[in-house]
A protein has these predicted regions:
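Intrinsically disordered, low-complexity segments enriched in small/polar residues
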Residues: 5, 10-12, 48, 56, ...
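Extended aliphatic helical segments
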Residues: 3, 38, 79-80
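N-terminal acidic leader/helix
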Residues: 1-35
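Short, compact, well-ordered microdomains
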Residues: 55-83
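Short amphipathic alpha-helical segments that mediate assembly, nucleic-acid/protein binding
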Residues: 14-18, 34-42, 61-67
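Acidic, aromatic-enriched beta-alpha/helix-loop junctions
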Residues: 24-53
Length: 83
């Protein structure tokens, strides 16, 4: 998978891309792992858009792909190449 965010291309699995984005946060230690970061993104997504953001049960990869899709819908990033 390949996504474009703020002029930077991120490549990898959905979970790997979310980990890359987590590392770019102001304080990556605030989110101890990728799954925690995804849940925080979800909370911010709902608060800022007023839209629902359902994430699937299961592993981090499925959650990451769903979150990337939601972020793509609002233009927060662009999916250049699907998984």
């Amino acid at each position: 998978m390949k996504v474009l965010r703020d002029g930077t291309t991120h490549e990898g699995t959905g979970a790997e891309i979310m980990e890359q984005l987590r590392q770019l946060t102001f304080d990556p230690d605030e989110y101890p792992d990728t799954e925690t970061y995804i849940w925080q993104l979800r909370t911010n997504f709902i608060r800022s858009t007023g839209m629902d953001c359902t994430l699937p049960d299961g592993d981090t990869e499925r959650m990451a792909l769903a979150m990337i899709a939601q972020l793509g819908k609002i233009g927060a990033l662009e999916v250049v190449e699907d998984a």
